[in-house]
């Protein structure tokens, strides 16, 4: 700080005389645009900017001394003839101008150090560079090159406008249209301290000009902050969609073969938000069990957003058991446009004497788990699902559609097990422990989705589980756990001696047929 203060004091003593001479001779001519043609092409705007900045600084009450000097390697004599002070005694400033690529950063670091000294000391040195240009053309004022007025405001307005354009969409900050000189003079006047500004106007390096002019606005190098905010805004832009999905939908365990489809943009909105026309798009899975006398257990648990996981434990002591639930949807169940669509699941049973168990558990968004303990020792029970939609069931565009589920029975006298458990959005289900030891026992499970369920906008996201393939020596138990007691689950097995015979039953809700 002390070398800077001594340097500024020495320059103040020298430059007061120069500013007085320039104020008497060149100030009045610089203010008039008609008379500004008497100056050379690169110097008239510089002296005018010096006069404007000096008057603005003196009106604020700060004892600032302005001096504008061009630095050109080819024309030092002409600058001295135009009564402008050539500060070649400042070694670092003039040497840094001859090497714009390497020394511009070091000079900006000087400016940052001097700007940091503003908050502690009283004296301020702000040096602004414009690099490039030749003496005969004198294209040192960028405002004149673009046809603007010859005032020094044009320089700073141009730079401030170029700073506004990239920063306005990213940062959203309001930047006033006051030029950089006026803002700098306002800052110097508010502190009421001697401010030395040596402006080195050599153009064609406007990105460096912007970097060196940014410390005029804020004391602690806002250019770094603004560029960090630019980068942070650019980084945050592609993450918005993923973060909004995680904020809206929570962290979801997706066990799927096609995670790109299940994590698509058509995510369902939770917590009672209405999401019409949103489809979860359960990826169409073609399922083929293992050949050659194996027990293929395929579990596709399409789970809702807040649904619990199903545990399917299948104990098959019989050779050919089939259990299938039917749905009874009752009393004004509004499932308008709920998106638990399972699109086109094609199911093919095993070909060579296998026991194929396929289970599709479509769960709703807030559905609890069902627990069906089925111990089947009968040999040939076969049931098929029946759906009863009752009493004002508004199933307009329900997305619990199992669209095009193609089911093909086995080819060689086998009987496959296909269980499609379509679970409602807020349905609770009881536990039924059914031990079937006779050979001719028929049970069929039906689910009752009760009245007043308003499932608009509640959507079901389905995740495909990987299929567990059990060997022919293993035994499986089919168990789906739930904790509710609203729905009555009735399981019904029907005996059929033909492998391809499936008898459809229209069941009442509370009937157990044997």
Curated annotation (Swiss-Prot):
Binding partners and assembly: Interacts with SERPINA5.
Parts of the chain that traverse the membrane: none
Keyword tags: Repeat, Secreted, Signal
Name used for this protein in its record: Semenogelin-2
Region (Disordered): 24-118, 133-491
Compositionally biased spans, kind Basic and acidic residues: 50-59, 72-84, 243-255, 285-302, 404-422, 451-483
Secretion signal, residue range per the UniProt entry: 1-23
Cross-referenced Pfam families: Semenogelin
Family per similarity comment: Belongs to the semenogelin family.
Biased composition (Polar residues): 34-49, 138-160, 177-196, 206-226, 379-389, 440-450
InterPro entries: Semenogelin
Source organism: Ateles geoffroyi (Black-handed spider monkey)
Keyword NADP on entry: no
Entry coiled-coil feature ranges: none
GO terms under cellular component: extracellular exosome
Keyword Iron appears in the UniProt entry: no
Function: Participates in the formation of a gel matrix (sperm coagulum) entrapping the accessory gland secretions and ejaculated spermatozoa.
Organism phylogeny: Eukaryota, Metazoa, Chordata, Craniata, Vertebrata
Organism domain of life: Eukaryota
Single GO biological process annotation from the record: negative regulation of flagellated sperm motility
Location(s), subcellular: Secreted
